């Protein structure tokens, strides 16, 4: 049980494609076959269609494994993602980029920063995981120095999201 379980319902497509992405990435690390490249293309596109935070997941994986940028087939994956994402980009262009306008200009923001915003980030990090947060955090910090690329990627995703949203709490 966790406090914010009801919030995960709108994120179900993101969770589906995130899971598929992790499966594809693990498959890529071991096999580097056509199936893994196609699954990466499909899962990244799906994450981007689900929520823009999907780009953070990909960014943190690349940050954890810089050798990915040397694989030219992964650049083809990027091209495939862009091709699959063209309908959304076209819609954004036709409608004067409503998502960008909302997130950068129209979203209700607080006039001044208060320390409570950042402190609540830590409280929420515990509440989201639920009653097992001690076990989860112990397991995370125990494996933080893993050299296995898949585990290293998972650690970067967890740390990256925590730091990203902590920094965004300073905005208000």
Pin down the residues of each PLM region:
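Membrane-embedded alpha-helical segments of multi-pass membrane proteins
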Residues: 12-20, 58-59
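Structural signal for membrane-spanning alpha-helices in multi-pass inner-membrane proteins
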Residues: 2, 22, 61-65, 88-92, ...
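Short acidic/glycine- and proline-prone juxtamembrane loop motifs at membrane-interface regions
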Residues: 3-13
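Residue-level signature of transmembrane alpha-helical entry/exit and packing/kink sites
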Residues: 11, 33-40, 53, 73-77, ...
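Membrane-interface alpha helices of multi-pass inner-membrane proteins
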Residues: 35-51, 62-63, 81-83, 162-166
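Membrane-interface transmembrane helices that cradle and orient dolichyl/undecaprenyl
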Residues: 21-37, 140
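Transmembrane alpha-helix segments characteristic
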Residues: 146-170
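Transmembrane-lumen/periplasm boundary regions of multi-pass, lipid-linked membrane glycan transferases
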Residues: 57-151
